A protein has these predicted regions:
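Modules that initiate DNA replication and primer synthesis
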Residues: 1-96
Length: 99
């Protein structure tokens, strides 16, 4: 399974649960780096889909945060961080891993 396929499945599970997996600014930034590092530009829409459940979501701000993550490329944060954030909010990821 590719990183994009994994991210797609994670996004669908998070949306189905209605979970805010990045409620703090730190988690929000970590999520942007995790997706940007492993999925690049192809992850941008997924980042928006994962963030828009938050009452604090602002599309323009999310665009800037993700663009910054793409350009900065901090390689120490990977897609596993997104799965960890989802799991921490109660989203079941076991079925996603074994598919």
């Amino acid at each position: 399974m590719t990183d994009i396929e994994s991210l797609c499945r994670l996004t669908e599970a998070v949306e189905a649960a209605g979970a805010d997996i990045a409620p703090t600014y730190l988690e929000y930034v970590q999520l942007s780096f995790a997706i940007a590092t492993d999925c690049g530009e192809a992850g941008r829409d997924f980042f928006h889909r994962l963030c828009r459940v938050s009452p604090k979501y602002q599309r323009e701000h999310a665009e800037r945060v993700f663009s910054n993550a793409l350009h900065t490329q901090r390689g120490e944060v990977h897609l596993g961080t997104a799965f960890h954030l989802a799991e921490a909010t109660g989203v079941s990821i076991l079925s996603l891993i074994h598919i």
